Amino acid sequence: MSDLAREITPVNIEEELKSSYLDYAMSVIVGRALPDVRDGLKPVHRRVLYAMNVLGNDWNKAYKKSARVVGDVIGKYHPHGDTAVYDTIVRMAQPFSLRYMLVDGQGNFGSVDGDSAAAMRYTEIRMSKIAHELMADLEKETVDFVDNYDGTEKIPDVMPTKIPNLLVNGSFGIAVGMATNIPPHNLTEVINGRLAYVEDEEISIEGLMEHIPGPDFPTAAIINGRRGIEEAYRTGRGKVYICARAEVEADAKTGRETIIVHEIPYQVNKARLIEKIAELVKEKRVEGISALRDESDKDGMRIVIEVKRDAVGRVVLNNLYSQTQLQVSFGINMVALHHGQPKIMNLKEIIAAFVRHRREVVTRRTILALRKARDRADILEALSIALANIDPIIELIRRAPTPAEAKAGLIARSWDLGNVSAMLEAGDDAARPEWLEPEFGVRDGQYYLTEQQAQAILDLRLQKLTGLEHEKLLDEYKELLEQIAELLHILGSADRLMEVIREELELVREQFGDARRTDITANSVDINIEDLITQEDVVVTLSHEGYVKYQPVNDYEAQRRGGKGKSAPRIKEEDFIDRLLVANTHDTILCFSSRGRLYWMKVYQVPEASRGARGRPIVNLLPLEANERYTAILPVREYEEGVNVFMATASGTVKKTPADEFSRPRSAGIIAVNLNEGDELIGVDLTSGQDEVMLFSAAGKVVRFKEDDVRAMGRTATGVRGIKLAGEDKVVSLIVPRGEGRILTATENGYRKRTAVAEYPTKSRATQGVISIKVTERNGSVVGAVQVDDCDQIMMITDAGTLVRIRVSEVSIVGRNTQGVILIRTAEDENVVALQRVAEPVDDEELDAIDGSAAEGDEDIAPEADTDDDIAEDEE
């Protein structure tokens, strides 16, 4: 115990944590998670391929059990679990994981549905043909070898690859404090980019992108936009969006549309994708899908999504793109080990690092070839000398009592050059090995043999003494001199060295190059999508139930006076058109919600539908939250100076904000007005700065004031008081009066009246205002007020779901301070909850039909005769 105590050294825990964690982090970064920029391999990939190479598990030989390879890897090179090694092998054998597979697998290696591979005892593997190019010239001293984990084996520090594997197959890894995510690319394009760099090392990133336009994924699909690619290639970091390749097919007979998905984004699990679509349909977050099935087979992928009759296939597909992994983002983070250190590298730096690596590999290979050629030439010189001096050499050997004395005799004297003097003198300098001392070789017209040369002469077989063999020796020597001259040219000329690299890259491209799979398309990030949209005037309709659509304005043809006109959309009987806007397809629709938020929508983003179609729910087009509803929609073409957005809340707060404050759209919406708890936005309108504003309260009060009484405020301001409310009173309507129309006011018990705008006096802001309609027990509270003309129609809705539509001309015109007359008789527990001016035009026959179906009898909707009490005005 005392001996153990003497071996324990107290340390500061903070210092130990720093030191140990740093060691661990560097071990993970360098030895596990990040690829080398030169060969694009992590250590485990490199060790697997090297083990297969040592085993002779070549592409043109028999498969070997995966377990055999795994055993060799973990036993010799990779002292970790077998699962990590086998998972690496599986990934290198999956056609949907690697753009160019490095392992040729036989058996079950998983699927794009996320199925696991079979156990390693069942599957068999061998190297793919292209994997051999990663280890080409490995035996030619092209790379350094290092000890394995226990010093009993040697493994390559890096592969002498001819394949630019880092870009071709990409890499993914999470280290400590950093990660890498490099997408795969097309081999032909990557080699073209490297060839362009070899020709001009000053080439720009833009120049390289002419050859390498972007990633090329094994699962194909489509990349939306080039900006993310450009950013990643320029800085080493960026984001690209990959969407599935899908098409919308229409049945020629029924007209029903079907979405067919042929390709999905990289690394997306197809089974989970289908489950997610089904879940969204079940939760009604995506509408318009009637059936979903997977018809994929060995010939390819095919996901079939059947669209309902009243749905638009392209709209459904766009919703799926936005809510599922039919479209995903791929974050590019090109981190690799460069000179043993992690570094974020751009496209040019990665290409330059590979070319430098190939330059070193070719140089080292050439040096070895030169050394071997000179050694062989040295032996051929000795054999040529022996043939030129055959008789004296044979005599010397015959007289020598032992081989050692014969060798010593050969070395001790000089030899005539004979008939090979010209050949030997021509190749003396080029073919002379670097290790050869000056006293050996050709000197003073004589030849002096080395010990190695003397041994080669003693080993010479008698058949080599024939004349034919003599000629072969001379021919081989001449070929070696030519080879040595070429090798020296490669080592002495940078241009020739790069030419060799270029020739080898071209050979790889010719042998393994293929066509691009992934298309790259421009999107709204790169171009202005409005340039692709035809400008035309359209009619946008939004129903009370929240269905929106547009139709070309030409669908509403001009009619002679007295004509029947075209019927409006026949939607559901309990629904009606709430808002009708005439706008241009390039206009922006500002959508304000009850929670004071603003959302943007371009008119061309609204689905186009026929007259008889309902359109699409606006909640599918805007990211509205639960219990959030739209309050107002306003069309805006240009954010002109002097135009304001005027807002009013239920608590009587008003706010005026310049329209250009809302000129920068955000996909998630923005806060248009800050609301106090329990408050909500009830009305929004555009003003010119010279308008007047009217606020109507549930207690029958109205205040009319000039717009300039409210100063312009910033987007996030709360606003100021517009009307002074008493007790539980609240604002129900905001009106910016325009023209000489009348104000129609309605109460919850079905009473209504029309009053000229001129009868409402202009007062100061923040006052109680004047009476707009007398609120009594008979009338009930005010539910709303609208400005109308004689030709308009209105719709009243009750909490029991009853809708009554009536012509405005049938509502009596009375004074401001009156109770009004009955418009709709409600049941005992039934109240009117909303009043809305109907936006769409209809003919008289249709109006009568709607009125007849909505009311139990004519007497229920016929206005009562005005009584003296009804129209008698009280003093204010």
From Swiss-Prot:
Residues 856-876 have a biased composition (Acidic residues). Its EC number is 5.6.2.2. It catalyses: ATP-dependent breakage, passage and rejoining of double-stranded DNA. It comes from the Bacteria. Its main location: cytoplasm. CDD domains: TOP4c (cd00187). InterPro entries: GyrA (IPR005743), GyrA/parC_rep (IPR006691), Gyrase/topoIV_suA_C (IPR035516), Topo_IIA-like_dom_sf (IPR013760), Topo_IIA_A/C_ab (IPR013758), Topo_IIA_A_a_sf (IPR013757), Topo_IIA_dom_A (IPR002205), Type_II_DNA_Topoisomerases (IPR050220). Pfam families: DNA_gyraseA_C, DNA_topoisoIV. The active site is at residue 122. GO terms for biological process: DNA topological change; DNA-templated DNA replication. Residues 844-876 are annotated as: Disordered. A motif (GyrA-box) lies at residues 559-565. Few gyrases are as efficient as E.coli at forming negative supercoils. Not all organisms have 2 type II topoisomerases; in organisms with a single type II topoisomerase this enzyme also has to decatenate newly replicated chromosomes. A type II topoisomerase that negatively supercoils closed circular double-stranded (ds) DNA in an ATP-dependent manner to modulate DNA topology and maintain chromosomes in an underwound state. Negative supercoiling favors strand separation, and DNA replication, transcription, recombination and repair, all of which involve strand separation. Also able to catalyze the interconversion of other topological isomers of dsDNA rings, including catenanes and knotted rings. Type II topoisomerases break and join 2 DNA strands simultaneously in an ATP-dependent manner. HAMAP family: GyrA (MF_01897). This is DNA gyrase subunit A. It comes from Klebsiella oxytoca. The lineage of its organism: Bacteria, Pseudomonadati, Pseudomonadota, Gammaproteobacteria, Enterobacterales.
